[in-house]
């Protein structure tokens, strides 16, 4: 993962500790599923990105099937894989039994664009990804939802999770 992503996670933990918000403060650790794991040929990906009209445009090309699968895996598969990891974290027992827990996962701008487009939250032509933009997975009324700070919300159901298979 990019150093600045790790630094962002550390800053969030430091701010929470300084505010004395309570709870368990864990350390920053790398989880490959929040990196750009879907890039199968980094050199060709960066060359394609450099020739595009920016990151959102490149992600749009990827979803339109204009980026070879030898460069980037199918975007739907990447979306499904990230959702699987997030769902597993949501369903995992709390570090301290009986206490609420929040997992803060920092990722790359490309993954935010990918998840918003692929899950149907917002198209890549929608809001740009900015520092500290976020996505949220939560449970309400025995259903799991995936949401964007820009207002898009989808239920994490079998159809959406089917991308991972």
Give the positions of each predicted feature.
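Acidic, low-complexity terminal tails and accessory targeting/binding regions
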Residues: 18, 22, 33-48, 96-101, ...
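A mid-sequence, solvent-exposed acidic-amphipathic segment
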Residues: 65-102
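Hydrophobic, Leu/Ile/Phe/Ala-enriched alpha-helical segments that form helix-helix packing faces
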Residues: 8-20, 82-94, 115, 119, ...
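Extended, charge-rich low-complexity interaction segments
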Residues: 55-78, 160-165
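General structural signal for secondary-structure boundaries
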Residues: 48-55, 70-81, 144, 154
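Phosphate-coordination/substrate-recognition cap region in phosphate-metabolizing enzymes
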Residues: 1-60
């Amino acid at each position: 993962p990019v150093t600045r992503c790790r630094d962002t996670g550390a800053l969030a933990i430091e701010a929470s500790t300084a505010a004395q918000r309570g709870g368990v403060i864990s350390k920053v650790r790398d989880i490959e599923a929040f990196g750009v794991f879907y890039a199968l040929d980094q050199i060709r990906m960066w060359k394609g990105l450099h020739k595009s009209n920016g990151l959102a445009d490149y992600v749009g090309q990827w979803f339109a099937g204009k980026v070879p699968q030898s460069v980037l895996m199918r975007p739907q598969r990447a979306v499904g894989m990230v959702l699987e990891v997030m769902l597993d974290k949501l369903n995992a027992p709390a570090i301290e039994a009986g206490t609420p827990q929040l997992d803060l996962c920092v990722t790359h701008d490309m993954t935010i664009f990918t998840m918003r487009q692929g899950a149907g939250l917002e198209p890549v032509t929608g809001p740009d990804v900015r520092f500290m933009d976020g996505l949220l997975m939560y449970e309400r009324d025995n259903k799991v939802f995936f949401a964007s700070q820009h207002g898009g919300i989808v239920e994490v159901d079998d159809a959406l999770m089917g991308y991972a298979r």
